[in-house]
From Swiss-Prot:
One of its GO terms (biological process) is N-acetylneuraminate catabolic process. The gene is nanY. All conversions require NAD(+) as a cofactor, which is regenerated in the reaction. The presence of EGTA and several divalent cations does not affect the activity. Induction: Negatively regulated by the transcriptional repressor NanR. Induced by N-acetylneuraminate, via inactivation of NanR. Binds 1 NAD(+) per subunit. GO terms for molecular function: hydro-lyase activity; nucleotide binding; protein homodimerization activity. The lineage of its organism: Bacteria, Pseudomonadati, Pseudomonadota, Gammaproteobacteria, Enterobacterales. Hydratase involved in the degradation of sialic acids. Catalyzes the reversible conversion of the dehydrated form of N-acetylneuraminate (Neu5Ac), 2,7-anhydro-N-acetylneuraminate (2,7-AN), to Neu5Ac. Also catalyzes the irreversible conversion of 2-deoxy-2,3-didehydro-N-acetylneuraminate (2,3-EN) to Neu5Ac. The reaction mechanism involves keto intermediates and the transient formation of NADH. It comes from Escherichia coli (strain K12). This is 2,7-anhydro-N-acetylneuraminate hydratase. Its cofactor is NAD(+). It holds the Pfam family GFO_IDH_MocA. InterPro entries: Gfo/Idh/MocA-like_OxRdtase_C (IPR004104), Gfo/Idh/MocA-like_OxRdtase_N (IPR000683), Gfo/Idh/MocA_Oxidoreductases (IPR051450), NAD(P)-bd_dom_sf (IPR036291). Transmembrane segments: none annotated. Bell et al. show that this hydratase allows the growth of E.coli strain BW25113 on 2,7-AN as a sole carbon source. However, Kentache et al. show that it allows the growth of E.coli on 2,7-AN and 2,3-EN, which are produced during the degradation of sialoconjugates by sialidases from other bacteria, provided the repressor NanR has been inactivated. Keywords: Lyase, NAD.
């Protein structure tokens, strides 16, 4: 039996707890969340801890799941590691590369597992695209292009997710596509350029994050990538396109359909596990109160079918690893800190590029910091 404690049981943390509790030989023994802990503890019949220190030091906990707001990840991760607890940390791992390195280093020094919650790696469509790329089906990769955007109206109650200092804004909070590009290409960029701004979302009812971001990545191999995020787009789009010398792949999360195009012929594949899940996401994109690509949940809200399936898959992967399973090659970087650190390093380089209006080398971010 592996016992889990969860720090932060709002929208996503509560769902992580619910699905982990469903796996064989897995048990949520306690939670800590001053606002939401009591209700979730009652639901899961576990202990509502009175403090973070009480949870991370408890003998009832083998692994700590950290799902607090983004800016509060570092303390529970490091305290869990110092208490010899395995750690799962929801994305983005941190809001700075230095913090991310400190967290990964603490877990390595303690000899405990550290898993980055980059859930997009578990998409059926991403796994299939990775397989096609490795098999050379679309030839040599030339470029990637991603978009994750939509339109956001004024909110009666502002979430922490709209405050840049707490969420990191679209770049960090929606880091999935950046991590996905680096995962699919198998390398991190050499240089990063980003422009952006807040063009339409200032004043009452809005946070302080940029509502448009445009990033360009140049890789050591010569590959290129462009990425776009924002909440000031009245034509919502959400996709990843990989272009090769023989063909291309599109993982479209707005229309929820995967496509492989070679020689003018298109073959379709599932983005998620079943057609029902793809249909569920497509329908949700059309009916949600906010465009699907930029929508976010809140405590008390349950995840849609497609996301519930992903959480089940992700938590089962973690549980199997802690039970002694060996990870497949494509997932090793989720467990050794590489995915966590490389995504944040690129995001930090992009942030520096925008603030200083110049092209930034990744080496400027990572040269002074190492993980043993």
């Amino acid at each position: 039996m592996i016992n889990y404690g969860v720090v932060g049981v709002g929208y996503f943390g509560a769902e992580l707890a619910r699905f982990m509790n469903m796996h064989d030989n897995a048990k949520i023994t306690c939670v800590y969340d001053p606002e939401n802990g009591e209700n979730i503890a009652r639901e899961l019949q576990c202990i509502n801890m009175s403090s973070l220190d009480a949870l991370v030091s408890s003998k009832l906990v083998d692994c700590v799941i950290v799902a607090t707001p983004n800016y509060l990840h570092k303390e529970p991760v490091i305290k869990a590691a110092k208490n010899k607890k395995h750690v799962f940390c929801e994305k983005p791992i941190a809001l700075s590369y230095e913090d991310c390195v400190d967290m990964v280093k603490a877990c390595k020094e303690a000899g405990v597992t550290f898993m980055a919650g980059h859930i997009m790696n578990f998409f059926n469509g991403v796994q299939y695209a990775r397989k096609l790329i490795k098999e050379g089906v679309i030839g040599e990769i030339l470029s990637c292009h991603t978009k994750r955007n939509g339109w956001e109206n004024k909110q009666e109650r502002l979430s922490w997710k709209k405050m840049k200092e707490q969420s990191g804004g679209h770049l960090y909070h929606h880091i999935h596509e950046l991590d996905c590009v680096q995962h699919l290409l198998g390398e991190i960029p050499e240089t990063v350029t980003m422009i952006g701004g807040n063009l339409a979302h200032s004043g009452p009812g809005f946070g302080n994050e940029d509502d448009m971001l445009f990033m360009t990545l140049e890789f050591p191999s010569g590959k290129l990538a462009t990425l776009e995020w924002g909440s000031a787009f009245n034509w919502p789009e959400h996709y990843v396109i990989i272009n090769g010398t023989k063909g291309s792949i599109k993982i479209d999360m707005q229309e929820t359909a995967g496509s492989l195009r070679i020689g003018g012929q298109t073959k379709h594949f599932l983005v998620h596990e079943t057609q029902e899940e793809d249909d569920d996401r497509r329908k949700g994109n059309m009916t949600s109160e906010m465009d699907g690509a930029i929508a976010y949940g809140h405590p008390g809200k349950k995840t849609p079918l497609w996301l519930a399936s992903l959480i089940r898959k992700e938590t089962l992967f973690l549980h199997n690893i802690l039970c002694g399973a060996k990870p497949e090659e494509d997932y090793i970087d989720l467990l050794n800190g590489e995915a966590a650190m490389s995504a944040i390093a690129t995001a930090d380089a992009a942030t520096l590029s925008r603030s200083q209006d110049r092209k930034v080398k990744i080496s400027e971010i990572i040269k002074h910091t190492s993980v043993m």
